[in-house]
Amino acid sequence: MKIIITLLLPIIFFQFAWSQKLTITQIKTNLENAPNPVAYARDVLKKQYKIDTIIVLNSTHFSGLADSLAYHGKVKKVYGPYQNKMLVQVLAKLPNTFTRISQVFIDTSIFTRRIADSLANSIVTRIQTGAASFEDMAQTYSMGGEGATKGDLGWVARGAIIPQMDKEIAKRKKGEVFKIWTKAGVHIIKKTSDAKQDTGFALILRVMI
């Protein structure tokens, strides 16, 4: 047993020393080429790592680095380092259903329900008759911050919004404008595009360097 340990020690020491001398570029290349990147980070690099599942809620507007990489990143590709201490590798991706929608939101904490409903009906009528564009109505009336994008919420993932809105949007045709009531107020929704499949989830490996 002592002989085996004695023989293994130089190998372990060499492997550790070798991993310590690798440049960032070499580490990234080795991770990308490794059959099992997790095992490589754990057993060869001897680095702390974490595996996360990232959900892409919107493929147009991203909340930060994680969902942006999850959507735009290529599988097996290693990105970074970030903050001089972390590499990020996209291990796998899975699809979800996305629909592009626009919104004019009337807040019932500001208006009574009766006034909000009357205003919403007026807005919908003006849009449907061509008296005003959805974009103009969003810039003028929306209280949810959509004025800056003329009402456009981007490509929204199924499950990213409340279930009743998800169900109603799924039933509607492209171009339809309709109202949905929630506890927050009334949402005037335009289904800008039909649903499509796109990257909705990604498995991410973070390696501390």
Positions of predicted regions on the chain:
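Bacterial Sec-dependent N-terminal signal peptides
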Residues: 1-25
